[in-house]
Amino acid sequence: MKVTLEQLIRAAGELPPMPQAAQKALQLIRDPEVNMGEVAAVLAVDQVLSSLVLRLANSAFYGLPGRVVTVHQAVMVLGSNAVRDLLLASTVAGYLSRPLPGYALPGGALWRHALGVAMGARWIFEKRRWKGTDEVYYAGLLCDIGKLPFEKLLRGVQVEAGEWLHGSFLEMERQHFGIDHALLGAEIGRRWHLPDELITAIAHHHQPAEAPQHQKMVAAVHVADAAMMMMGVGVGVDGLRYVLDRDALELLNFEESEMEELIRQVTDQIYLAELFLSDRAPGW
């Protein structure tokens, strides 16, 4: 069953919009000289976002001696980077938290996977002290956004018994629809006016050798994605069908021993995120 790109994009158009408060706050945070009081004022009008920043600021992770009771206090404690990450993670949770039976994924699985890829890719960049840690985080968070419009179509495909035993969902997407979720996700990114480096990382995170530019970012997302698959985080029945690109490891100068460290770091961070975003990711 071949479908047009426009049909798939229309399906993507059904995704819920980003809350206005989150949009405005993220816009403010892009300014390096942002007044966090303005950010607090924007977040204070959104009950869910307010509760998230207060919950994180009062967590044992920050270990404050007294209780944070206002959104203004919370954003001052957290800082712009933590607030930004929380807003993006919360928003994407709304997209990726639903069950995706077409991919054999329960509720929350794809979201957990996306968060792990984002954190893992950023950890790789931070450890190497490379610029672009924010961008690689966003690329990891959005790398599988193309699965959402595909999922409904996959449910309608009559797959012969045992067909999944010999291939991946990626291969099945190409076979049945002529495009895969990575390329569709990149097209969604273009429609959302994402930066070129994010679009490239989304498009090539399964085949990093094909990336025409931003190769280190693509490689970091690819390796972090592979780490999540090794952990069994947010993968379907085809989880072992994907091959880790050794050239990507070489490009990153990534030692095998680092994989264990990456997995350990990401496991702790996912657990922390679960504590504060559970009401945004049903099914956890």
Predicted features along the sequence, with ranges:
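Conserved alpha-helical "signature site"
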Residues: M1-Q158, G162, G167-V243, R280-W284
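Terminal helices and disordered tails flanking the catalytic cores of nucleotide-processing hydrolases
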Residues: M1-Q7, R246-W284
